[in-house]
Swiss-Prot record:
Coiled-coil ranges per UniProt: none
Gene3D superfamilies: Translation initiation factor 3 (IF-3), C-terminal domain (3.30.110.10), Translation initiation factor 3 (IF-3), N-terminal domain (3.10.20.80)
GO BP: ribosome disassembly
Coarse class of the protein's main subcellular location: cytoplasm
Pfam short name (any one): IF3_C
Family: Belongs to the IF-3 family.
Keywords linked to the UniProt accession: Cytoplasm, Initiation factor, Protein biosynthesis
Organism the protein comes from: Buchnera aphidicola subsp. Schizaphis graminum (strain Sg)
Protein name per its UniProtKB record: Translation initiation factor IF-3
Keyword flag Protein biosynthesis: yes
Amino acid sequence: MKGGKRIQFTRPNRINNEIRAIKVRLTGVEGDQIGIVNLREALEKAEELGLDLVEISPNAEPPVCRIMDYGKFLYEKSKSSKEQKKKQKVIQVKEIKFRPSTDEGDYQVKLRNLIRFLEDGDKVKITLRFRGREMAHQKIGIDVLNRVKNDLIELAIIESFPSKIEGRQMIMVLAPKKK
């Protein structure tokens, strides 16, 4: 056999014989206070019930220990943390690019996508890009952004509206309205 270092798995709580205190404040299975007892007595009570003695708060004086099924406790804890992760909605910023010369059909498709993103609860970044001579007609670009703003007034709140051109583009950010 090949010898090597074993990776030590550390639990978040000490259980059974890992507890180092002499006396512990013992809590029963249902959360009822049993009182301050010797560690040996607490271990015997847990063993009688076929459960584990788990050190809940090691920094207390004396440390608080509870009689419980440690495997079930870990399972419930991981299950509840997974539930909480599921409930959290990560807000993404979706980007749609327009040009000052975007045709009506393309405009409608992009508008439909904007509506879908906002209904899903995502923020939307609308980038209006200028190329070549389009830079001379910035008013047309602002008109396009105003049209988008007016079409989405019921669904979105304007977080930022461009006052001037940045480089060769204008950027407007929309956030969904709270329901």
